[in-house]
Curated annotation (Swiss-Prot):
Domain of life: Bacteria
Record-linked PANTHER family: PHENYLALANINE--TRNA LIGASE, MITOCHONDRIAL (PTHR11538:SF41), PHENYLALANYL-TRNA SYNTHETASE (PTHR11538)
Entry's localization field: Cytoplasm
Keywords for the protein's UniProt record, in alphabetical order: Aminoacyl-tRNA synthetase, ATP-binding, Cytoplasm, Ligase, Magnesium, Metal-binding, Nucleotide-binding, Protein biosynthesis
Molecular-function annotations in GO: ATP binding; catalytic activity, acting on a protein; magnesium ion binding; phenylalanine-tRNA ligase activity; transferase activity; tRNA binding
Protein name from the UniProt record: Phenylalanine--tRNA ligase alpha subunit
Organism in which the protein naturally occurs: Carboxydothermus hydrogenoformans (strain ATCC BAA-161 / DSM 6008 / Z-2901)
Length: 340
């Protein structure tokens, strides 16, 4: 039997040849295979034929139905592929075009200052040491020559958690822990940057702030070694023309002790409002490690000596960037932070 001469098949081909998208194809499908479609009606009309002709006529109609179904499936896949290619063509990305740049974050100014300080001291042979911010009273005070009845404890108002545990008031406990760990081995050269906590809050003080302390322990360490290290640090950080001045001071954990001043970075030492006309700015405290601190850490103070120093990173940053209110560092003001 020549199926191509069948009227129903030819009628279908005449309709489907004009189809250009999936919606039109669905319309043709419904027209021929739907409940009221051409093929469905032809099958229903079989009852009007004589019984002996029904099987052959039904076979012909089902053959045409199968051909239509197969052709519809084929055309549907072709149209789907065509639609996909058109979509991909419209959404194609030209990889040669410049992309959109992302806004990159920056390091906090205090972090930048800390990194610079660490860089300077590590270039002089110091290594970085860290310790817990929740500290034992022993390491924060007693091991640093500040027993419970020492009057110097009144110099610092502390955040106590229990009677024997507090938020550290300085990073000096790190120095004690390092000495205990390595005693009696020598030498020790460390810096210990980190957060510290005190009950203080005004334009030049914060209840939480950052410090960086340093320690060197060895045989025959002298005060002149301390002076040389600090002078190198100051000239690297503030510039080669910066001068340094040492003033006698008192710290329970060092003896002798000294405050370290630098020539004013604003006026160059001539005198201005920032330095209050003196030409000098205080930046850190220092001194030779107290013999009692060495002994408590496990060293023989008759043979071993050392020096220590400590500075507030906010103080250094304020001088470097000309900032007059420490609280700006912690206000999370994006306008301020974008300046650095």
């Amino acid at each position: 039997m020549n199926l191509h001469n069948e009227e129903l098949w030819q009628k279908y081909l005449g309709e489907v040849i004009r189809v250009s998208d999936l919606n039109e194809l669905q319309t043709v499908k419904v027209k021929f295979l739907g409940k009221k479609g051409e093929v469905t009606l032809a099958l229903k009309n079989l009852k009007n034929l004589p019984p002996e002709l029904r099987p052959e006529a039904g076979h012909k109609i089902n053959t045409v139905k199968k051909l239509i179904e197969e052709d519809l499936e084929k055309r549907e896949q072709e149209l789907l592929q065509k639609a996909l290619e058109e979509k991909l063509s419209k959404e194609a990305i030209d990889v040669t075009l410049p992309g959109y740049s992302l806004k990159l974050g920056k390091l906090h100014p205090l972090t930048q200052v800390q990194h610079r300080i660490v860089e300077i001291f590590t270039s002089m042979g110091f290594s970085v040491a860290t310790g817990p911010e929740i500290e034992k009273d022993y390491y924060n005070f007693e091991a640093l020559n500040l027993p419970k009845d020492h009057p110097a404890r009144d110099m610092q108002d502390s955040f106590y958690i229990t009677e024997e545990v507090l938020l550290r008031t300085h990073t000096s406990p790190v120095q004690v822990r390092v000495m205990e760990k390595y005693a009696p081995n020598l030498p020790i050269r460390i810096i210990s940057p980190g957060k510290v906590y005190r009950r203080d809050d005004d334009a030049t003080h914060s209840p939480m702030f950052a410090q960086c302390e340093g320690l060197a322990v060895d045989k025959n360490i002298r005060f002149s070694d301390l002076k040389g290290v600090l002078l190198t640090f100051i000239k690297e950080l503030f510039g080669p023309k910066t001068k340094m001045r040492l003033r006698p001071s008192y710290f329970p954990f060092t003896e002798p002790s000294a405050e370290v001043d630098i020539s004013c970075v604003i006026c160059g030492g001539i005198g201005c409002k920032v330095c209050k006309g003196s030409g000098w700015l205080e930046i850190l405290g220092s001194g030779m490690v107290h013999p009692r601190v060495l002994e408590m850490a496990g060293y023989d103070s008759s043979v071993v000596t050392g020096f220590a120093f400590g500075m507030g990173l906010e103080r250094i940053a304020m001088l470097l960037y000309g900032i007059d209110d420490l609280r700006l560092f912690y206000d999370n003001d994006i306008r301020f932070l974008q300046m650095f």
